[in-house]
Amino acid sequence: MNKKIRVRYAPSPTGLLHIGNARTALFNYLFARHHGGDFIIRIEDTDRERHVEDGERSQLENLRWLGMDWDESPETHENYRQSERLPLYQKYIDQLLAEGKAYYSYKTPEELEADHAKQEAAGIPPHYINEYAGMSDDEKAAYIAERKAQNIEPVVRISVDEKAIYKWNDIVKGEIEFEGGNIGGDWVIQKRDGYPTYNFAVVVDDHDMQISHVIRGDDHIANTPKQLVVYNALGWEAPQFGHMTLIINSETGKKLSKRDTNTLQFIEDYRKKGYMSDAIFNFIALLGWNPGGEKEIFSCEELIELFDENRLSKSPAAFDQKKLDWMDNEYIKNADFAKVFELTKPFLVAANRFDERAKELVKLYQPQMKSADEIVELTELFYGDFPELTDEAREMLAAETTPLVLSTFRAKLAELPESDFTVENIFPLFKATQKETGVKGKMLWMPIRIAASGSMHGPELPETIALLGKEKVLAHLDAALNK
């Protein structure tokens, strides 16, 4: 690539950072960093009706949390918000008007709706019908004067050559082309309130900021021919376009929807639940791209080095919540304890469980956690009531050898002084119980685990027993023996 790589992520401050938008930002970031280019943040805030207070700060904060940095943004550069660039848009709108490539349109929303209703009834795709078609200059002047007298504010439309072919070689999908007659006719580049439309402003911005590549979701494919109309009208070279496939829900097979309740879809949600940012970064990077091979855990540096835009998938990317939870567990298991402890601290404090056992409990459950907030549920045994046993657990306790195992193990535990109730002293008692009862393996460990903790699965049993404390464990064993 000879041209300087410059890519952008251009969110609208209309809400929280969604997984799909985070992927767009991440792929642009990896592409820029891999090629030694620039990653730019631009805020597209011309949709004033949907503008959310603090939306911009939220977007940037969540991108930072994920581990991304950028070279240019509204924080460091002037006029990187579309609302600050209105004079620039007006300059090019005036140019197109002066060159006869755009014009004022006075059709009202009601008239446009009526046109579309007729087209729909006739089975014709909706498109704008030029209101000046067939008018003489005098008729056109009279029409405009009449509309002005009615205080109808015009929009500005750009002229579309319906016979032209708008095509590009897409980085992901290969060659794509649209006929000019299939993009809806002359379209609005400036709204009645004076603000530019998205498809016009984005072209001016990308040209002005010397964007070399536009990498975005394939829901933007239909926007691309409209943007090429503007590039052609202004005599500018278009950037290279790449349209990533959509993200689907792995359980439904349908496009990921904000209404899907089986997935968390906003980065803020993952932060609140105590997921590790590196895990989310890793997971999102593999949604629609893969370096090949079986490896799935990658550092940011590895992803930058391996990223290859030619390996972007042409098939939809499946968002699998269980896979993400598995990946976060891998990161938590292998993270420094101090980092994991800090991650769990707010949840322990909120649950009133940040006591002298907190560090040992986090250490105990670190290998099991899929997110830091799970520490509260995992430690319920130490602070709440004894859990309700499953049918399978009850069957295990009903085994013929269980009473002998539990009573023998209980007797040996009871002999340990409180001061010696440690993992080092508890561990040998299992071997001693096996030797005395002749019971071994699952039939030895499982009844003790169920009786002591109420669960068939969990962290290391000697550590669990030591942290529960002598009094509580003996009480649990007595309860199991007396059933």
UniProtKB/Swiss-Prot annotation:
Signal peptide: none annotated. Keywords: Aminoacyl-tRNA synthetase, ATP-binding, Cytoplasm, Ligase, Nucleotide-binding, Protein biosynthesis. One of its GO terms (cellular component) is cytosol. GO terms for molecular function: ATP binding; glutamate-tRNA ligase activity; tRNA binding; zinc ion binding. It catalyses: tRNA(Glu) + L-glutamate + ATP = L-glutamyl-tRNA(Glu) + AMP + diphosphate. It comes from the Bacteria. It is found in: Cytoplasm. ATP binds at K258. A motif ('HIGH' region) lies at residues 11-21. Its EC number is 6.1.1.17. One of its GO terms (biological process) is glutamyl-tRNA aminoacylation. InterPro entries: aa-tRNA-synth_I_cd-bd, aa-tRNA-synth_I_codon-bd_sub2, aa-tRNA-synth_I_CS, aa_tRNA-synth_I_cd-bd_sf, Glu-tRNA-ligase_bac/mito, Glu/Gln-tRNA-synth, Glu/Gln-tRNA-synth_Ib_cat-dom, GluQ/Sye. CDD domains: GluRS_core (cd00808). A motif ('KMSKS' region) lies at residues 255-259. Its main location: cytoplasm. Monomer. Catalyzes the attachment of glutamate to tRNA(Glu) in a two-step reaction: glutamate is first activated by ATP to form Glu-AMP and then transferred to the acceptor end of tRNA(Glu). Belongs to the class-I aminoacyl-tRNA synthetase family. Glutamate--tRNA ligase type 1 subfamily. This is Glutamate--tRNA ligase. The gene is gltX.
